Structures are given as structure tokens and as C-alpha cells.
Amino acid sequence: MKGTIKPGGLAALTISALLTMNCTSDKTSEGYIGPSQIEIKDGKMTPEALLAFGRLSDPQLSPDGKTILYGISYTSIADNRSCRNLFLVNADGTSPRQLTRDGKSISCARWCNDGKSVAYVQGGQIWKADVRGLSGEKPSLVRRQQISDVKEGVGEFKFSPDESKVLYVSYVHSNVKTPKDSDPSLDKASAYVAEDLMYRHWDHWVTELPHTFIADFSKGITRENSTDILAGESKLYELPTEPFSGLEQLDWSPDGKYIAYSCKKKTGKEYAFSTNTEIYIYDTGTGECQVIPMGGGYDTNPLWSPDGKAIVWLSMARDGYEADKVRLMAADFTDGSVSNIRDLTADFKYNAAGPLWDEDSRSIYFNALAEGVQGVFKADIDGNISRITSPDVWCDYDSPFAVLKDGDNTTLLASWCSMDFPTELVSIDGKSGESRQITDENGHILSQLAPDTMEARMVKTVDGKDMLTWVMYPPQFDSTKVYPSILICLGGPQGTLSQSWSYRWNYRLMAAQGYVVVMPNRRGTTAFGQDWCEQISGDYSGLNIQDYLAAARELKAEPYIGKMAACGASYGGYSVYYLAGVHENTFDCFIAHAGIFDEKYMYGETEEMWFCNWDNGGLEEYSYTPGQMGPAGDGKTFGGMVQGGSPWSDNAKAKRHYAHSPSENVTKWNTPILCIHGGMDFRIPYDQGMAAFNCAQMMGVPSKLIMFPEECHWILQPQNALFWHREYFDWLDRWCK
């Protein structure tokens, strides 16, 4: 964002600021959480050590290319919360320094064009502050000003290139009603009223929807002075798309005249059964909107080229299939019109993610999971693709967030992690791919931990294919001794066991407790081409289960492997429940977190119906006609989608799928099992875990149920996370050691 702040923009607003608050931030605020000074005993990683790591995120390069602004969250177990503050580091990795020490989290921090001030979100509003001592050892924010006054709150924001306008995300009421909507005096009544699907999503009842607004700085950032991008629509859509999308779904054109955005313009049943989001071009002057005509599935993350003559975005071809191949699409943009739409990754085997234009507007950097690790790639506008980072480096790279040029030399700035260390910033040579870590946020903790060892093993499947299986060995591993082991059952089901770092399913932590951790990339994983990924749809109980058993039996044949557990979450929980009925004494205990137990009930109680509809029916029986609407109650079509994966479908794959639900095999359960679930899990509702536990009890199987009433599909509160880990390892140790 190079350029001058124009009159009437952000600079002018500082003269007539909405609200001027504290003048400086060089002191520590009440509620501040700083870096942990934990001391590790005997080099053994513990759950407490895992929660002590600082979590680095959202790096932003300054306009002059010299300084990176980023955030780090620290956790207080005692306070049961985390707090995110801002940091700086020179782009070459020198002089890391802390910028804020606030007691309230700061998010969405962005450089202003002058390179001397930043804007950010805190307490649901946008703030601006100058950076004092930018290049010094103790920088701070001074002259803080609240520059928005949106009573509904602000989630994220994005400046226009000249900073005269801002996009921001706030909320509007939805079609899900509460008693107060009909009678304000019923302020103590609690109920939700819905007359269509999508009344709840992920972890919340959908009583409000995100909308994106445009505000002119000269008029003040208030709801009254803002334009809702979706104001002209006849129905209540969401922008950005729930539950995880943000302003990466919207992008300003370089001249500020247009906004490209991604939106699923569907509601209710149509929304629940479709993944069809489209890319729209919004004219900020006229309010008119045009769509890039793609159809099909997800179209997301539009990004203008620096010269404004092209747009790229990510795209899936098929509606209703959330694990379709992710293509990197491009289109020319001339005189307000889109033309020459093309797939830059037509000959690329893997899923593209995180595109970033080179400043020459001729090439795009992106990342992709490829053969078990996530690397950085480069595509030119003609679709020629090269790999930047080496597949021999066992790390997962996020997509670059900035490109630095020095003559013919190109340096990419990105972040990376592995199963051995959490996210850190890294610089990548654009030609050689050589990488150099430029932050060391958690070195003081990692240096205290005893090292593990890792193996990439190719396991033969029952049909003779090679399956990448990561194996992590405990510190001081001795092949003459016998160790307990854990088989990891991946969620998704379409995902990948790559070199990622997790704060719950942390394999280094598991290995540190003395376990050999076995991680098969079974059928359905996404880093090995679309055929390997798509095989699992309609075959949950089939080849991928045999893949798990093949990996388990190969490892158990090793003299150093003793007892073995199978553990997994979400679809991994389904796998655990299914294996419990077919494993023939391969495993000594099971742990299922947020798993699917009964497929028929799952179809009727989850929220994103497209997932079950596709995967339960398989690809061959899937059918969709754009605009098709079935009559209510015909049991076959809703919202334009044929119910090919429903329990009442008459296709062969759906019938087989439901016949092989884990709940059908409970009479064969004979192995101790721990069932864990969150009470606010609306993806796989908590009664699935309760039913599995109840059935285990009725079968006389040693079993335990742990229910977190305030957690969703993930366990996020620090004390709950600590308890989760303690119970997890207590169960493993009880039955495997």
C-alpha cells in the first residue's frame, strides 16, 4: 500500500477524530498476558508447555518493505483466556520488538500508507495510532484514536488503496427470531424460532448475519454513514461467508473503483444443500454489481492484480462438493468488464490456496498441500507452474504475505510450522527456495524439549497402493525396547496429515509421553491428487478403514511396538467408532472426539447438509440442476438439490453407507473407549457422543464420557483444553501402558 494519504481520508480524520483516547501505550495495561517463562523438567513436553507457546499470526509488511507487523497471543490458564498483542521485526529478521502490552486483544492490525501509523480492531471498534520509536528497541503506540462508532461492532476492516474509504464487517438481524422480536417485554424468555434450514451454524444460533459495509472517512465510520454492499438484495445473505471466512473474501481494485467479493447468494434450504458461491464485482460509484459467470461450487478469495487488469480467485467446479479440486482461476478486467476466464492450474495435481500477486502482475504465488507437505508454488498468467520450496523440507509453508524485490532477486515473506514447532515467520529465496526463519518466538521453550525423531514410511494398502504414513518416535527412542503407540484417525474426512502444528492434536506432545505416533494418509486425504481424495465419498466403511488397519498391522509387526490405541476427531471419531466393531483385537483402547456414531441421525441433525448429501451418496448418484426446486415434502428435492445421500435415497451407495453406520456394529464392541464431545457442536451434535457412550455401557465395555457443555467441535477454553489433554493421556496410559 504505497502512496500518499489524500485530504478527506485517514489523515483528515485525525484532525476531527471521533473519539480520542489514551495518548500512549508504552506501559503495561491491566489484564495483560505476557510470554510464558515455563521451565521444562527433564526435557518432557507437557500439556502445560503446549499452552505456554506464543501463537503468531497475521503478519503485515510495512509500505517501505522494511518492517513486519504481526500479532502474538499468550494464554493464561489461571485466567482461562488468551490475549493478543502486536510485535515488530525487521524484514531481514533483525530487531524483534514488542509494540503493545494491552489487556484487551488487538486484531486486524494494518499499516497506514504513511508507514508510521497503524489501524487495528480492539473492543469491537477500529482504532488508529502512531508508532513511536518505530526502529528503536522499545516502540509503542501513541495518540490512539477510536475512528469508528458502530454500535453493532466491527469484526474486520480493509482500507481502500488511497485510504479515503474503508470496508468493515458488522452484523444484521437474520430470519431466526427470538421472543423479544415479537414482544420486547419478554426479555427473560429464551427461544429460537425458525421456518427454514440454516438456523444454526457451527457453534451458534444464526440470529444475525455478517454484512460488509463501505464507509467514507470524511463522513465518519458509523452504520448510519455506511453503505451495505448487500443492501440491494431481495434476501438476507451473508458476507463474508460463515463460519470461518473473513475479508480475504473481498478485495479493492487498485484504483478503488471496484470491490471484488465472494458470496453465496442463497438462504435456508438452498444454502444448506449448496456450496455455490460466486465472485461479484461491485461498482463503488454506482452500487451496481456484476457476477463472474462460473456456476458450480465454491468461488472464493478474489484478488486484483497490482495493475488492476486482472483478477485471480480460487474455485471448485462442482456444487455441493466441498472437497472438489481447488483451482486457481484468472480473468482479464478491462473497462469494467470481465473476460478470458481461465484455469491456471488445469495441469496441476493439487489444491491451490492463498494466492498473492507478484508486483509485475504477471505471476502469482500460492501454496498447496503436495505429497504430505505444504509448499509454495508460482504460476504465471499463462498457467506455467513451478515449485519454489523443496518437498524435502518437512515443514508446512503458509502462502507468502509479501514479495520483496532487489534487482533480479526475489524474496518471499511467509510463515511456516511443522509437527515439531509452531508458526514462525520465514523468508524464502524466490529462485532457490532456500528458507530462513526470521522470528524465534518460542525458542526459549523449544530449546528445553528433548528432540523426537520422524519417519516418512510408505505402507502398502490392501489394494497394493503406497500410502504415506508419518511415524513420530519418542525422545531417546531405543528400538530394542517396547513402546505403546497411537494410530491417528484423521478428521475431514477430506484433509491431510501434513507437517502442521496443532494445539490439541499435537503429535510431538503425544510422542513426549512415550508413545510412537502413527499417522496414515489414508484414502480421502487431499495432498495426493483428486482420485485418492474422492475415493472415500460413499465408502466411509471401506478402503480408508482398511488403510488404517494396514498401517496398524505393519507397525505392530515391529518388535518395538506393544499396545496400540486408535484416536481421532470428527470423521476421525467416526473411524474410531467404526474400528471398534471390526478391528479384531488390533487395538487396546479407543478415543473418539466429536465423532459420528449414527449416520441416519447425523443426516437429520447437522447444519451444512451438502456435506452429508454428497459424501453419503457418493459421486455417481449425485444430481443437481441449477434452479431446480422440488415441491416441499416430496422427500427427494429441496433447495434445488437431489437428496442422493439421504437415508431415504434408493441409490446403492447411500443404502450401503447407512447399513454400515458405526451404530450397526455395537454388539461387536469389546475394547475400552473414551467418548468426548462439545455441547455447542452443531456440526456433529453432542448426542452422537452420548449415544456411543450409552451403547458402550450397555455392551459392558469399559467406557467414559466427557462432555464440555460450552465448547463446540473444538475445545478452545484454556482450562478445558488442559483438562482435555489430561483425560486423553490418562485414558491412554490406563489401557496401553
Name the predicted role of every residue range.
Residues 48-84:
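Beta-strand-rich domains and repeat architectures in extracellular enzymes and scaffolds
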